């Protein structure tokens, strides 16, 4: 944890060096350190991404950088290629609806909601998936599709 945190504290993280882009999500692989993912992802979004023509760091590389920020802003990120799962973080939005193709996903859309009342609510306090408590910060694609509704209660 200390070595990973050092990457951010010493300014060694470079989002334009694409192998680095999963780094903030690695904290969540360690129980009790998930808050670091939530804090760091938000800091990186605020620091490196803007709504200007040059608002994406580095080379877009066929959507890599914009995909990182879109997934991160929605609150989930596929941090391990080839593994159909996501690491969860605090969404920027109060509600996100993912419209799925009914040919492949007949149960309908996925909705991610938060109880955000303030921009200071950076941390996930508790979560439910399909109305049932979710105690992990990683979720399989199959479980997300099956649960359909991911709700996050946030805290400062």
What is the predicted function of each stretch?
Residues 116-156:
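C-terminal beta-sandwich/jelly-roll accessory domains of carbohydrate-active enzymes
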Residues 1-111, 142, 148-149:
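Active-site core of glycosidic bond-cleaving carbohydrate-active enzymes
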